[in-house]
């Protein structure tokens, strides 16, 4: 599972979940990607579960890039504990995903295989997603 090697502070405030994603909105490494449409927290366990679902479907073919990382700790107090007495212990790690963010990228397989693998991965995640293809940036060509 994904988690940071070391952090400056053990516990953090809950992150903002408003607005659209500032970066990571385009397919850069692979040919196909899975893009978030809604906002949510994604835990390291959900990311790992989605990765396993994709790689099992694709068997030995293709390459998968995970474009999100769970940097933020989330805490939880034990059951039946009264309020106060400090912040709870770190329960796990989350990645805040906003609309437009590319979650996973795939290359080296056909579009049908990539579409199905990413569909299986999307069922493991708490966000609505869509399948996107890499867009070649159209610029001026130097051919004359």
UniProtKB/Swiss-Prot annotation:
Task: Give any Gene Ontology cellular component.
Answer: cytosolic large ribosomal subunit
Show the InterPro entries listed in the entry: Ribosomal_uL16, Ribosomal_uL16_bact-type, Ribosomal_uL16_CS, Ribosomal_uL16_dom, Ribosomal_uL16_sf
Q: Where is the composition biased (Basic residues)?
A: 1-19
* UniProt keyword terms in alphabetical order: Ribonucleoprotein, Ribosomal protein, RNA-binding, rRNA-binding, tRNA-binding
Q: Which GO terms describe its molecular function?
A: rRNA binding; structural constituent of ribosome; tRNA binding
Domain of life, source organism: Bacteria
Which cysteines share a disulfide bond?
A: none
Please list where the region (Disordered) is annotated: 1-23
SUPFAM superfamilies hit by this protein: Ribosomal protein L16p/L10e
Q: Which Pfam families match?
A: Ribosomal_L16 (PF00252)
Gene3D superfamilies per record: Ribosomal protein L10e/L16 (3.90.1170.10)
GO terms (BP aspect):
translation
Does the record's keyword annotation contain tRNA-binding? yes
Alphabetized CDD domains for the sequence:
Ribosomal_L16_L10e
Task: Cite the record's note on assembly.
Answer: Part of the 50S ribosomal subunit.
Q: What does this protein do?
A: Binds 23S rRNA and is also seen to make contacts with the A and possibly P site tRNAs.
Which family does this protein fall into?
Belongs to the universal ribosomal protein uL16 family.
Recorded protein name is Large ribosomal subunit protein uL16
């Amino acid at each position: 599972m994904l988690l940071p090697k070391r952090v400056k502070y053990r516990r953090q405030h809950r992150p903002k979940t408003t607005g659209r994603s500032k970066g990571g909105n385009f397919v850069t490494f692979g040919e196909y990607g899975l893009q978030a449409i809604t906002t949510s927290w994604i835990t390291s366990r959900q990311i790992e579960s989605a990765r396993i679902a994709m790689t099992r479907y694709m068997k030995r073919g293709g390459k998968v890039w995970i474009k999100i990382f769970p940097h933020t700790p989330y805490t939880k107090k034990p059951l039946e504990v009264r309020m106060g007495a400090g912040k709870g212990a770190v329960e796990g790690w989350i990645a805040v995903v906003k609309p437009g963010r590319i979650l996973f990228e795939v290359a080296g397989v056909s579009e049908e295989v990539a579409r199905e693998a990413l569909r299986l991965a999307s069922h493991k995640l708490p966000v609505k997603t869509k399948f996107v293809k890499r867009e070649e940036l159209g610029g001026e060509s130097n051919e004359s």
